[in-house]
């Protein structure tokens, strides 16, 4: 059976506290070969690192401060995250020239800008995002980017570092064709597409094949949020990424196996891992 990768799932969320092990088992049974775990602050960074140790070779952690978590203490949060980042950097013989600097962390994320609910910490969000973009440049870990109601500001900031960045994912893409084309102008980045693509009202099934090449998409759930049809309204989980894959394969007019294969290759290109291990 072919496998798929869920490139964005919050398995550390409290919604999984009652059945986390069972949810992992369901993901594996459904054909999910790997799960990538974004962090949103210091606490969740520790949590996803712990899950990666519990599920080695299956769960892969990230590190970052989510824009909605940028509050009055954001500088202290970033300082603590920077300390964790340094603790996980390989040194000496373990770090060979041209090889990844980290044995476990696969991305800086979930980071970005979010002006949807409030612009109270707008300036602080920009500062925190830019600092973490610099971490990506320095470490060459890709970015997992969250952006709502701030694409212009995000694009402006990323242009400053475009040539130095290793790439990344524009997570939870739900925009139109013009917005997709603007994001794809960052040629080392891909679009993360999830459950919204399965909604009856979604335009993504038409817009994505029109302007987004197959080699510029990765699959995600963003669980426990935004469950795909036929689970809409319920708690989302990684096993449901298969529904996203089926929907998009049909939209692109190719087999589910070919769509899974290509999106796995895309994940391998962006993140420091080998698809041969999936």
Question: Residue ranges of each PLM-predicted region?
Answer:
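Mid-domain alpha/beta scaffold segments of enzyme catalytic cores
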Residues: 1-278
């Amino acid at each position: 059976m072919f496998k798929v990768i869920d490139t964005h799932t919050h398995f550390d969320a409290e919604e999984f506290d009652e059945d986390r092990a069972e949810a992992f088992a369901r993901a594996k049974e459904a054909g999910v070969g790997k799960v990538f775990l974004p962090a949103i602050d210091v606490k969740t960074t520790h949590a996803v690192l712990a899950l990666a140790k519990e599920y080695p070779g299956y769960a892969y952690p990230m590190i970052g401060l989510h824009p909605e978590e940028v509050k009055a203490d954001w500088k202290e949060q970033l300082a603590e995250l920077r300390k964790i980042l340094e603790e996980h950097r390989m040194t000496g013989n373990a770090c060979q020239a041209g090889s990844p600097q980290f044995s476990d962390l696969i991305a800086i994320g979930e980071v970005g800008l979010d002006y949807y609910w409030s612009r109270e910490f707008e300036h602080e969000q920009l500062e925190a995002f830019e600092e973490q973009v610099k971490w990506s440049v320095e470490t060459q870990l890709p970015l997992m980017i969250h952006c709502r109601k701030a694409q212009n500001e995000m694009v402006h900031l990323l242009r400053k570092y475009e040539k130095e960045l290793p790439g990344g994912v524009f997570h939870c893409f739900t925009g139109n064709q013009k917005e997709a084309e603007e994001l794809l102008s960052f040629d080392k980045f891909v679009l993360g597409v999830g459950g919204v693509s399965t909604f009856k009202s979604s335009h993504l099934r038409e817009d994505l094949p029109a302007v987004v090449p197959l080699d510029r998409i990765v699959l995600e759930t963003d669980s426990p949020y935004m469950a795909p049809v036929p689970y809409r309204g319920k708690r989302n989980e990684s096993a449901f990424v298969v529904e996203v894959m089926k929907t998009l394969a049909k939209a692109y007019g190719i087999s589910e196996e070919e769509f899974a294969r290509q999106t796995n290759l895309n994940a391998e290109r962006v993140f420091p891992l080998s698809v041969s291990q999936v």
